[in-house]
Amino acid sequence: MKRSDQRRDAVFALYQHEVTGRPLDELLERAKPFSRQLAEDVEANRAELDELIARHSKGWALERIAPLERSIMRTALFEALHRDDIPVEVAIDEAVELSKEYCGTDAPGFVNGILGAALAERGAAG
């Protein structure tokens, strides 16, 4: 299974966890180690990631952003800021591709804009 597929699995587990309240470990019990670790790390850093997203989503309260888009952005921000083995450009590109495939037509630009602004602020923009 490609890493992009494992990243998608982590994003979907985070999304399901947020929407249904099901325990993350239950949602990830059959997941590959990369997916499991990524989802757990994103959830552990959720407050920091949400604060960054909220600060850069001009005119949008965090709660108004679709849960799947939030999960995609949280994952990309975590990878860009905390994973030295994943280039910032890859984290952003993967997030934009996921939003193109699974979210509304405006989502890719929205996701890209928030990620770009948040990472530029942190000095991590590619």
Label each residue range with its predicted role.
Residues 1-126:
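N-terminal interaction/assembly modules
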